[in-house]
Amino acid sequence: MKIIKKIDDLKIVDKERPIALIPTMGNLHAGHLSLVEQSKNLKLTSLVTIFVNPLQFGPNEDFETYPRTIFQDEENLEKENCDFLFLPDKTELLDGIKNLKAPFSNFLCGKNRPGHFDGVITVVNRFLELINPEFCFFGQKDFQQQLIIHDHLKKNNFSTKLIVGQTV
């Protein structure tokens, strides 16, 4: 597995096979790892991002105490034969970023977490623009997030296909 920390270094990503973007905030569990396994079964180049996104944390949610388990995450991704791990620097990734408004964010989970899905879609959009993956993987348990990502891909004419993995 190759670890990438700078945006400019994303150019080393193997483009001979389609790219599967698997965005995460780290603290990986079986569900995340099953998405990597699914991408490998489809013979895709797996690119996992680990970025604890400050934009999706509300005032009563503690960004500072979100679990950061990078060494364990790296080990688990190695075991799954992940191809690339992107660990972007917060300042570099968010520099000049345009904050987006997420549709469908005023009900279900979003009703109690104002701004959460705006932060999610802002950073996912940044990854899509930087990586231009053929596929983007999300877990089935995040239903509202799936709706928002699917809508964003469609409205912004991304050719990226959303793949929803089974809840593990």
Where are these regions (language model features)?
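Nucleotidyltransferase catalytic core that binds NTPs
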Residues: 1-168
